[in-house]
Curated annotation (Swiss-Prot):
Belongs to the allantoicase family. Pathway: Nitrogen metabolism; (S)-allantoin degradation; (S)-ureidoglycolate from allantoate (aminidohydrolase route): step 1/1. GO terms for biological process: allantoin catabolic process; purine nucleobase metabolic process. The keyword Hydrolase applies. It comes from Chlamydomonas reinhardtii. This is Allantoicase. It catalyses: allantoate + H2O = (S)-ureidoglycolate + urea.
Amino acid sequence: MASTSHNPFYAAMQPQAQHWGATSPTSTGAGYDRPSAGYPAYTGYAAAGTSHPAPSSSSPSTALALYNPSSLYGLYYNEAVHGPFATGLQSNPFTPGLAPLSTVSRPSYATEDPLRQRYPATSANPHDPLNWITEDLFAIRMERAAISQQRTPLRSASVAAR
């Protein structure tokens, strides 16, 4: 993977780094030392002008605050994950059909289903004798089943010939 790390397109296709805790080997993890990562630097309660009650114990708390009081979003806000159209997927500019909200429309065909076009009333009322399955329709369905799921069809040619 190190050989492709120089490629900017490969880096663009990776999910964005979620900076929890220490973001560099030299940081302690108490603060977020990379304000250029897309969110403002964490300022804490004192700089935001709000007061908090004194801790009940003398040991410092290890809870991670996932919000910044002075920002609209939290410390980590990714539009693909937290946005209004959040599917959990990263939109990739090189595969536009796989984007969460794609501008590429699904292809529409003149005949969506040729089987339904040839037999329009087959599934309307199965108890109607006019809709009973004909032999060529059954042959088409067996052909489809044999192609799609490579199993022995229910009525094979050798059994029908006996």
